[in-house]
Curated annotation (Swiss-Prot):
Keywords of this entry: Cytoplasm, Initiation factor, Protein biosynthesis, RNA-binding, rRNA-binding
Self-association and partners: Component of the 30S ribosomal translation pre-initiation complex which assembles on the 30S ribosome in the order IF-2 and IF-3, IF-1 and N-formylmethionyl-tRNA(fMet); mRNA recruitment can occur at any time during PIC assembly.
Function: One of the essential components for the initiation of protein synthesis. Stabilizes the binding of IF-2 and IF-3 on the 30S subunit to which N-formylmethionyl-tRNA(fMet) subsequently binds. Helps modulate mRNA selection, yielding the 30S pre-initiation complex (PIC). Upon addition of the 50S ribosomal subunit IF-1, IF-2 and IF-3 are released leaving the mature 70S translation initiation complex.
UniProt source species: Clostridium novyi (strain NT)
Gene: infA
Subcellular location: Cytoplasm
Protein name in the entry: Translation initiation factor IF-1
Any single Gene Ontology cellular-component annotation: cytosol
PANTHER family with a match to the protein in the record: TRANSLATION INITIATION FACTOR IF-1, CHLOROPLASTIC (PTHR33370:SF1)
Pfam families for the chain: eIF-1a
Length: 72
């Protein structure tokens, strides 16, 4: 899967779950499960409930995503 195939969406973190997983509500109203991307994990970026995030979704599984950006 190339980078062109991913779907980028905005959302809000609802809940922090174990193993760096998060419950995220997208702007469309859908709730998904998301994990932190490698760059955010390497730079120790903290993600807390209420944060606005950008999520990449795979076209194969729209219920899971990767958090690629935390808005300030």
């Amino acid at each position: 899967m190339s980078k062109d195939d991913v779907i980028e969406m905005q959302g809000t973190v609802l809940e922090a779950l174990p193993n760096a997983m998060f419950q995220i509500q997208l702007e469309s109203g859908q709730t998904i499960l998301g994990h932190v991307s490698g760059k955010l994990r390497m730079n120790f970026i903290r993600i807390l409930p209420g944060d606005k995030v950008t999520v990449e979704l795979s076209p194969y599984d729209l219920s899971r995503g990767r958090i690629t950006w935390r808005a300030k």
